[in-house]
């Protein structure tokens, strides 16, 4: 099996992102309760949170914060 990848991501609102994966699964993930710890502190600001990009097969923010696609698909 190939590695799981996020292929597309759209900001929905609040701390929610609609994600598409390379295994034909798509879902809206609510990150509100996932933003624990210092690395994710900037993402608690919705204006910062919505400025993500796809890098290394997942979503990433400018501060280097990211989530493994395997984790995201199970949320």
What feature does the model see in each segment?
Residues 1-75:
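Motif-centric detector for short Cys/His coordination patterns
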């Amino acid at each position: 099996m190939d590695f799981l990848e996020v292929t597309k991501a759209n900001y929905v609102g609040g701390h929610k992102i609609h994600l598409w994966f390379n295994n034909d699964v798509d879902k809206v993930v609510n990150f509100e309760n996932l933003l624990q710890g210092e690395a994710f502190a900037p993402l608690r600001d919705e204006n910062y949170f919505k400025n993500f990009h796809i890098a290394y097969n997942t979503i990433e923010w400018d501060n280097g914060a990211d989530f493994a696609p395997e984790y995201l698909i199970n949320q």
